[in-house]
Amino acid sequence: MSDIPLIDLKADPFALFAAWVSDAEKSEPNDPNAMAVATATPDGRPSVRMLLLKGVDERGFVFYTNLESRKGRELLANPHVALLFHWKSLRRQIRIEGPVEAVSAAEADAYFASRSRMSRLGAIASDQSRPLDDRSTFEERLKAVDEKYGDGPIPRPANWSGFRVLPEAIEFWQDRPYRLHDRAVWTRDGNGWNVTRLYP
């Protein structure tokens, strides 16, 4: 019914993820590593926003944030997350669910140092997710931080770090004609994975 290859159930999910991201890097005009990150309060009130994936290995998927932002506070209180990658040009998506753990201070320091100077200054000047009476207030704080550090090193603030998502489930979705889509989910089984194809 279609010449689109079916998802390979024998594939390692991390290898398949890497292959799909590689395809997205060739076809998506902007931010192929963009993902929706859903968190929830302890009583189950969800929130979601777009972030950029900043690292992936056999341990999990890494992103960074202000720990005092809404997502940071929710993850500290309820350390579980759902991620969604959607590549419209490829008609594909990947969903990932699992608990999170904090990245090490060394990992956070290394990534923070790799950011542009203005991004580092902004991380210090911003009370992320807090009310802001006037944009000029933030710009004045940014200027003050800029003057404080000058051309010197800019330290990572204690309230800025990262999380690693430890995947318990990774679902791959491939569009097919007539909404007869192809879906497969890998779920953790000890140190291995169980894989199941799903009805569309």
Curated annotation (Swiss-Prot):
Binds 1 FMN per subunit. Its cofactor is FMN. Pathway: Cofactor metabolism; pyridoxal 5'-phosphate salvage; pyridoxal 5'-phosphate from pyridoxamine 5'-phosphate: step 1/1; Cofactor metabolism; pyridoxal 5'-phosphate salvage; pyridoxal 5'-phosphate from pyridoxine 5'-phosphate: step 1/1. Keywords: Flavoprotein, FMN, Oxidoreductase, Pyridoxine biosynthesis. GO terms for molecular function: FMN binding; pyridoxamine phosphate oxidase activity. Substrate binds at residues 54, 111, 115, 119, 179-181. InterPro entries: Pyridox_Oxase (IPR000659), Pyridox_Oxase_CS (IPR019740), Pyridox_Oxase_N (IPR011576), Pyridoxamine_oxidase_dimer_C (IPR019576), Split_barrel_FMN-bd (IPR012349). GO terms for biological process: pyridoxine biosynthetic process. It catalyses: pyridoxamine 5'-phosphate + O2 + H2O = pyridoxal 5'-phosphate + H2O2 + NH4(+); pyridoxine 5'-phosphate + O2 = pyridoxal 5'-phosphate + H2O2. The keyword Oxidoreductase applies. Its EC number is 1.4.3.5. Signal peptide: none annotated. FMN binds at residues 49-54, 64-65, 70-71, 93, 128-129, 173, 183. It comes from the Bacteria. Transmembrane segments: none annotated. It is an enzyme of class 1 (oxidoreductase). Belongs to the pyridoxamine 5'-phosphate oxidase family. Catalyzes the oxidation of either pyridoxine 5'-phosphate (PNP) or pyridoxamine 5'-phosphate (PMP) into pyridoxal 5'-phosphate (PLP). Homodimer. This is Pyridoxine/pyridoxamine 5'-phosphate oxidase.
